[in-house]
Amino acid sequence: MAASVQPRQFGHLEPGSAPVRGAASSNGAKAYPPANGIPRRADSPVRGCGFPPLVSPPPRKPPSDGSDDEEEEQEDWRELYGSHLQLEVEPPVRDARDEGTADAWIERNPSLIRLTGKHPLNCEPPLARLMHHGFITPAALHYVRNHGAVPRGDWSTWTVDVTGLVKRPMRLTMDELVNGFPAVEIPVTLVCAGNRRKEQNMVQQTVGFNWGAAGVSTSVWRGARLRDVLRRCGIMPSKGGALNVCFEGAEDLPGGGGSKYGTSITRQWALDPSRDIMLAYMQNGEPLLPDHGFPVRAIIPGCIGGRMVKWVKRIIVTTAESDNYYHYKDNRVLPSHVDAELANADAWWYKPEYIINELNVNSVITTPGHDEILPINGITTQRGYTMKGYAYSGGGKRITRVEVTLDGGETWLVCVLDLPEKPTKYGKHWCWCFWSVEVEVLDLLGAKEIAVRAWDQSHNTQPEKLIWNLMGMMNNCWFKVKVNVCRPHKGEIGLVFEHPTQPGNQTGGWMARQKHLETAEAAAPGLKRSTSTPFMNTTDGKQFTMSEVRKHSSQDSAWIVVHGHVYDCTAFLKDHPGGADSILINAGTDCTEEFDAIHSDKAKALLDTYRIGELITTGAGYSSDNSVHGASNLSQLAPIREAIKAPAPVALSSPRDKVPCQLVDKKELSRDVRLFRFALPSSDQVLGLPVGKHIFVCASIEGKLCMRAYTPTSMVDEVGHFDLLIKVYFKNEHPKFPDGGLMTQYLDSLPVGAYIDVKGPLGHVEYTGRGEFVINGKPRNARRLAMIAGGSGITPMYQVIQSVLRDQPEDTTEMHLVYANRTEDDILLRDELDRWAAEYPDRLKVWYVIDQVKRPEEGWKYGVGFVTEEVLREHVPEGGDDTLALACGPPPMIKFAVSPNLEKMKYDMANSFIVF
């Protein structure tokens, strides 16, 4: 929130006792009849969420603050959202993908297309399903944009604070919001600013995930006008500095090192009666669903969804606009030349001219659908074909015309508009409309592409070509559908229609195909035909089904699918920096999301060397979003099953499974060091991580999967939990990394009770005890260990040291540790290392190296500077057949300090030097 004023002392802090209709139930809660007489199923999502059904608000009455608004007759929208709307939607269910997450309690519609993996939920309905329901979208099918876990709201205890530059700060209960203010009920189309973003990602990857063309929905919203609430609280005049109204939600989010979701609008907007801004508590005649902001959210018609804060807890009137992390680092359209590095370096995020508020004009072709086939025969050519779609604009502007072209814009057909919405008394149009046009089938037969564009009442229209921007927002270029000739049946021809993309990680779309061709053409001149580049020989026209890919899931044949391409990575198993397990964990699967989460652009370019063909999507039997697969003939690894509890006593029963683990304790050991304890799914389980291996911690951060490797510090036989020691890299502390560590800041922001997913074991090194290692599947014995660690790279060394010392006196392995850090305060696990070195002087010798001494008066007795040849010669043994060097730390340290100096010390760098 903007920090221009301090919150004022509340004059009305205690929840009030505004009268609410209804009798007391047996459990003491208020009992209410169903809203609008609509019966609710026993499994309704409204049940069990800590709130009663709502009655319709009392009859409208003039505001008590002297408002001179002209009262208008409100329309009755019940026929649009009556019982027939609910009956057309299948019952919500608890999705297996939510199991083990903070959203496990929420029931959701199973047809929603998930765009960001398991958690948090970001989804859109299938485009055909969205259009089937017409003007009003059932709440269960409304698109969802969540930044984190859904707060568990309770109607009876929820309050909204209104504070800042107001004369009468208040804390309003939900009953007061419903009964104390006149209700307004209007239909409003909500659109995510990222709608159609996947088209931009096909040109160049943005920082956002893959929205398709269904990030748009329309509901009838009921609530209290924001202006009435602000007037009741006595908003101060603009001359007194009351220029902005900030909203803050209830979620605990990782952005900015931990924050709520917040944003703001101007005072002028907030008080403008023509804008119909409300604090909504009902959607389509029902209380809000949890995903849509229960119990109360902001609705700002004509604006992007990102301004409409859900789960509203605070409204603060301020001088400056919100200073919330998400107000600046989200919902911006930056110039096309600005990439992430430039945006951070030159503070483009904070330039006010690039903020998005009102929607732009947009339109989409929904009929013909993607992969729809139109047979060409004597019957179809005698009648027209009706194309259909939707269109919308922002700021209350009405769509005035929609046009379709079959010849690349040379000529245009004017479409018939269906405008179900009447203008408001101020002449505003807050909803989408639909269009249709009948074309001759023979004209379609001669077309290679069809495109649509819309115009609004200000004569704004859509550009022909896509305009890329870093966040991939406000994409509104012509929506183009390719037309191709096919043979659906023997002896018959037809037309197959191809949309530009498919949402999320679903394969298909002409833009993906076009990008693949461009990539191949660009790569071809520099590639040689050889067995290491098999796609040069076999890609042309080669296609595989997912069932074929699943057969290749072992060391003998390891195939993966990434973005619809099939890759044979068998030849790369021995060369992968993370070991063969890093590939085998995903062999035989579509690992698009996980590959993107942990690989650089260089690695992505290298992957194309191993492309052998394209994936055939075979319908409902396949999902590219890390779906649950059935059994296959794997020799080493089991198939992926997301979030399935492993049988006791080992939690990590398969390196492919994501295991949900709950944060049960968090200790702050220093300013930037945290010790986390995560409970395993069952209290009698051990983690099952061999010494030397690591796990992946997986989380969805800012809508994208993030995965990082960590080695627990707890003992391998610890029952019921494991511990992670994490150094938090905060933003704005290192000039080369202004955003800090994405995962470490996320973990630091997690509240106790939250869940993460872990996968493993992973890694190419395992210590089996008494000097015996297994490295890349081959046994190796060592009597002496040279251990060089930097920063948090101490954790795998710590596991090996711990294992050796627990097996005394049998394990006679000698360990020589050189541990580098910036200062003495950055040394992790120092107390344990010093204690062990003192207790076992014949087994463990420790030498610290730091860049600078912060407290010279304490008498620092170890090294200062860098890890040099001199340091290594003095503190680790010479190379030899019985000596093994283990290293873990920043890549520059390994490359420039460790590797060249160990080579000078006669280490066999191919067989006796291991980097974790």
UniProtKB/Swiss-Prot annotation:
This chain belongs to the protein called Nitrate reductase [NADH] 1
Please name the GO terms of the biological process aspect recorded for this protein, alphabetically. Answer: nitrate assimilation; nitric oxide biosynthetic process
What residues does heme bind to?
A: H576, H599
For this protein, the record's CDD domains field holds: cyt_b5_reduct_like, eukary_NR_Moco
Q: Which Pfam families match?
A: Cyt-b5 (PF00173), FAD_binding_6 (PF00970), Mo-co_dimer (PF03404), NAD_binding_1 (PF00175), Oxidored_molyb (PF00174)
Q: Point out the gene that encodes the protein.
A: NIA1
Please give the Gene Ontology molecular function terms for this protein. FAD binding; heme binding; molybdenum ion binding; molybdopterin cofactor binding; nitrate reductase (NADH) activity; nitrate reductase (NADPH) activity
> Which organism's genome codes for this protein?
Oryza sativa subsp. japonica (Rice)
Q: Where does FAD bind?
A: 708-711, 725-730, 737, 742-744, 792, 795
Please describe the quaternary structure of this protein. Answer: Homodimer.
Q: How is the cofactor bound?
A: Binds 1 FAD per subunit.
Essential cofactor(s)? FAD; heme; Mo-molybdopterin
